[in-house]
Amino acid sequence: MRCKGATLIVVSAAFVAACGGGGGTAGGAGNASASPSAPILNLGAPTVKLPFAGDVCQSLAATDFPGDIAGTSGWTLTKTEVIDGMAGAKTVCRYDLTSGNGSTSQPGVGYESVDNWDSAKQIAVKSTDNPYQAVPGVGEDAYLVNVFGQNVLYVKAKGYSIVISGVDPFNDLPTLKSFASAILGRI
C-alpha cells in the first residue's frame, strides 16, 4: 500500500505512521520525478536540549548527500526547521533537495529525548505492520523501521534519540548510516 505524496509521521512512544513513504526515484534519462516528503514530527516527546545551539539544520550539509546518484547533476540544498506541533520546540530539520534534472527529495533529521528509548524500541520490535531491523555499528544502539516502504533509522547516541528519515534516492540503510555518522561527528 502506498499513499502518494503523503507525509510520514513518527510519534514518540506510541509510534504511529500515517500514510507515507514510497514513490519517486532520482530520475534517469531526463525523467524528473518527485519523491514524497518525509519530515519527522516528534509529537509530545519530552523536551530535549538541542544540539548546534538549537539550529538542528546544521546536522547535515550539502556534502553529506551523495552527488553521484544516477541521472542527477548535483543537488541544491534548502534547509527547513519544522516546529513540534505539541510542545512548540524546534526539533526537526527537513532537507529540501533539488537535482539538476528536477528530481526532488526531502530527507529529515529529528532529535528526541532518550527517556523512552527502551519502550519505543520494544514497540518497534513487536510491530507486525512495520518491519524492524537491528542496526549494528552506529551509536550506542540503533534500529531501522520500514513504514510503507519508507526507511526510518533510530540512533541512540550522545544523549539523544536521533531519528533519520530518507526518501528516494536516500532511503537505503548504508546512506542513512552515513548520515548518522556525519551527525555524530558534529555533535
Where in the sequence are the language-model features?
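N-terminal "mature-domain start" segment
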Residues: G20, A26-K90, S161, L176-I187
